[in-house]
Amino acid sequence: SDFTGYALRTFVSPNGTLRTVIAGCASGPTQWERVDWSADTPPGTSVSLRVRTATTEADLAMARWVGPFRDRPSELELPPGPVSGERFAELELTLDSGGTMTSPRIDRLTVQYNCPL
């Protein structure tokens, strides 16, 4: 029998998350504009994004999540945003297999922001 196939269907999580912290403008407030990603999303799978911001990296743990954003690129100033203009942003990408035997894969993540004068 093929225990590998059984193990993949039985013991591997069908969903996953990827989190990363981005430091915005060194001078402080940051206008978070857009997040885009390149992904392989087989039929039935999906990728969504949540964002939270804080003045310090340590304060991110207590910040409120905004999202999920499902479109790419995700305009962070539009619903379900806007994302507040704090210096640090934490991005959380959720990869969902949708109950299929395949998973999405992220190839690239791009964050666009502006530093107000």
Per-segment meaning from a language model:
Residues S1-L117:
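Beta-strand-rich ligand- or partner-binding modules
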